[in-house]
C-alpha cells in the first residue's frame, strides 16, 4: 500500500471542463422529454401567482444579443419566482404583422401585384410562422423555460379577435375617429407612422429666409413691406397658406438693403447676421396682435397667405414669423383650423408632388428643394440660402426620412382619456425611477394616435361604410367580425365582400339599397401588441390581469409600454402592468452600437456554439442592464474565467463530499467547531443577501458579485485553503472532517439552488451528483436562512480574526520576499499581542496554525524582538519552522520520526495511520 492511499483525497466524476456547447443540448432535451416546465407549474399550483408578461419580439431574422439579454433576464426572474414559492408561468409571444415582412417578401421576389391581397397575406403568414419556429429554437437554446408549444402569436385568429374587440370598445367609448390631419408619413413605406415608429438622425438641410410681400396690411403696413420667414423645408412652400405670429411678441418694421421687412424684435440681431445685412434701420415696432388677419402675397403662386396668431411661435430660432402649411405640420394644422383655412397636401403616398403644386408635378419632394430655391431667387423672394445639419425624423424600419402629410386617417383620441393614463402611470411600481418620468412625459406630450396603415399585412380595421359614406362601427358589427376572425382568421376580411362580413339581415339608414363597402386600411402593429393584455392575459387561464411585470428594452417606453397602457386604460380604466423594468442597449466593447457595417456584431449562436448558453447567461447576471451594457469576445472570455472559478470550486466541494452521506454524517450546528459555525453563518448571510437584495430586487449583478465574493474570499482564500489539512489528512469519520463536510455539503446544495436561475444547465449537472430528494434542482425551492444563537458575537470574533489573519499574511509575505521561507508551511509564527488580541486567540477556539497554514504558531508574553513586523495591536515574528517535513501532511514538525514504525511521519499522521491502517503499518508501505 502506498502512503498516498491513506489520504482522503476527493474523488468525483463531475468533469473539470463544462463542455457546455454539447452537454447543454443534452440537458435541454432531457428537460423537454420530462416536461420540467409543466412539472414546475403543477408543483406550484395553488400558490401565489407572479406573471411576467412577455413583450413579443418581431418575427423576422436571427435573434441578437439584445434578445438574449431580454429573454435570459425574464427567465432568471421567472425561475427565481418559481423557486421562491410562486406559480410563475411564462407564455412567450411573437409580433408577426407589419412592413418588414412585406419588405422581405419583396426582396425574395414575391410579386404582390400578381396575386390577390388574401394570397399575398398568406405568403406573409407562412414567412412569419417560419421565423417564429426559428426564433423559438434559438430562445430555447438559451435555456429559457416556458410554454413553448403554446405561445401567443399576434396572427393567431383568437388573438386577432381579441384585438378587434379592443378596437370596438374604444370606438364605443368615442375614442376612435377619422380625420384629415398632418401625420408622420413615410414615402419609403408608403404608409402613415405612429410616433413610436420614428427615430431621429442628423441630416443636412437647406436653410432659407424668404420674403412674403404684404398684400393687405390693414392700414399698418404697405405693399412695399415684406414678412420674413425661415424654413428648412423649402418643398413645403407650395402648400403655404399662412404666416403665424405670436400675439405677445414685439415685432419691428425695418429697412435693410433698400427694402422694408417685418421681423420679431428679439430676433433682429440674429436675422441680420444670418442674412448678412450690413445696416438695419428700425422704422417702428408693434405687437404681434396688430398683424392678425393681414395677408401676404405667396412668393410664386397667385394667391395670398393669411397672417394668424399662434402660441406655438417661439423665439428659439428663425424670425418670429412661421411659414404655415396646414397639410404639412401639426401646429400649422391646429392654427389653421381656428381660421378655417383649407388643408393642402400636394404630395402623394410616394412623396411625389401632385397637380396641386403647379410647376412641380411628378417631382419627388426632396428633389424639389433646389428647384423651389431657384424659383424664389428668380422672384426676388430669397433673402438667404445656407445649409445646416440637424436632427430629423426617420422611418425606424426603412431608415429613410419621413414627412408630415395630411391624409384621411383613423385616430385614437388620446386627449379624451390622457389624464386617466397619466393617473395610472403614477400607480405603477417603477423599478427604475426615471422610467416613470419618461413614460409620463411621452404620454403627456403625445398627440392623438394614428392607428390606420395603408398596408396589406396586418389586422384590418373592422369598419364598414354605408352608401352615404358614413362609417359603421357598432357593437353588433364588431362582435360579428371578431367571431369571424376567431373562426377563420383575419384573411376572411379580404376574401369576402362587405355584405358577407356583416351580420345576417344587417341594415343601416345610410344604405337604403342595402349596399356597403369596407375599410381597406390595417391597424398599426403597436395596436396589435398593445392589445396583448386582452388577447393573452385575460384569455389564458394560467395568467392574470394586470400582469405583475413587463420587462423590455428602454425603446419600449415609446412602444409596447406606451401602447399597452393606452389601450388598457381606454377599455379597462387600469394599467395592464403592476411594475415595469426597462433595459439598455447592448453595445460593443468600446461602447458603440452594434451594426453589420461596423462589423462588431456578435451573434448569440456563435457564443453558444463556442462557449455555451450558461456563459451568456452568466454575462447577463454580471451587468447592470438598467443602462446600456457592453459585450465583446474579450468580455465574454473574462466571464468564462469566472464560470471556470465557479465550476472548479463546486467540483472541489463535490470531490470532498463523495464519502459524505448527509442523512448519516451531518453534524448539528450546535456541535460544529467555531470556524465551521462561522462559515455556516456566512453561508446563511449569503443566502439572505442573494434572495432579499438580489432576486427579490431583480438585481442580478448583486447576485453575481455576492456569489463571487463568497467563493473567492470566504471559500477559496480561507476555508477551502486550510480545509485540505483536515479533509485530506484526517481519518474518514473524523469529527473535524465531518464538520467541514457538513459545511461543504450545505454550501453545495445552497449555491446550486441559488445559481439555478442563472446557470441552469451547470446547476442541474451539479445537482445530479448530490443526494437530494428532488430529481431536478429546478423542482426544488430556494434555500431558507436563519439566525443562530450567539451569531453576532461569533461573527465579531471571526471578523477580528480575519483582520489578525491579514496581518499574519503580510508578515509571511515579507518573509517570503526576503527568502526566509518559500511556502507558508515552512514557517513558525510567533505573535506578540495586546490583551485584546490575546483574548481573541482564546475565543477563536481552533488550531490557529492550521487556519494560517503554517507549521507552528505561538502566542508570546515576551517583548517582541526588533526583527518582528510591527502592527498597531501586535507584533509578528516569522521564523523558519524547526523540525522535518512530514511525508504525509507536509507540515514541518519536531516530532517527525517519533514513531519508529513510521519514521517519515509526524506524530499526528502516525497516529491516524496506525489507527486506521494497522495491516499496512505491519506490512510496511511502498
Swiss-Prot record:
Binding site for L-isoleucyl-5'-AMP: 552
Sequence motif 'HIGH' region, location on chain: 57-67
UniProt short sequence motif 'KMSKS' region, positions renumbered to this chain: 593-597
Region annotated Disordered, chain positions: 1-21
Cofactor: Zn(2+)
Cofactor-binding details, from the entry: Binds 1 zinc ion per subunit.
EC nos: 6.1.1.5
Catalytic reaction(s) noted: tRNA(Ile) + L-isoleucine + ATP = L-isoleucyl-tRNA(Ile) + AMP + diphosphate
One Pfam family cited in the UniProt record for this chain: zf-FPG_IleRS
Binding site for ATP: 596
Gene Ontology cellular-component terms listed: cytosol
Single biological process term from Gene Ontology: isoleucyl-tRNA aminoacylation
Family: Belongs to the class-I aminoacyl-tRNA synthetase family. IleS type 1 subfamily.
Entry's free-text remark on domains: IleRS has two distinct active sites: one for aminoacylation and one for editing. The misactivated valine is translocated from the active site to the editing site, which sterically excludes the correctly activated isoleucine. The single editing site contains two valyl binding pockets, one specific for each substrate (Val-AMP or Val-tRNA(Ile)).
Subunit note: Monomer.
Record-given protein name: Isoleucine--tRNA ligase
Native source species: Enterococcus faecalis (strain ATCC 700802 / V583)
Phylogenetic classification of the source organism: Bacteria, Bacillati, Bacillota, Bacilli, Lactobacillales
